[in-house]
């Protein structure tokens, strides 16, 4: 496992009393993010609809790092609820609130309660590319075959 990096986190007023993102097991890759909606106003996500769910958190990533917001497998498997823009990218220079864009692919409305774990956040290094314009690319066995060209 790589050594931990320091990431500053700011809790906004509507996240008071909620736990900070946390790893749920010794070797978990993602920190669970919780919904920071009002306790007396659960959110209802209708089938086929999407919604931006607040977390009440802002982070300051070190340069050359990103955070990815990904689905929680249990929500997807049990309820058909997933992150619409998975993975959502949080750049190192973004300082706004982390929002989770959820979509309900299930058949029933899904209720999002305050403090419910709704997504996971993976922090990873970023490699920046230097693009070089060329007239031709090197040949490969695959060539230009895409979408399904290597099998079903």
UniProtKB/Swiss-Prot annotation:
InterPro entries: dUTPase (IPR008181), dUTPase-like (IPR029054), dUTPase-like_sf (IPR036157), dUTPase_trimeric (IPR033704). Its EC number is 3.6.1.23. Keywords: Hydrolase, Magnesium, Metal-binding, Nucleotide metabolism. Pfam families: dUTPase. It catalyses: dUTP + H2O = dUMP + diphosphate + H(+). HAMAP family: dUTPase_bact. This is Deoxyuridine 5'-triphosphate nucleotidohydrolase. It comes from Rhodopseudomonas palustris (strain HaA2). The gene is dut.
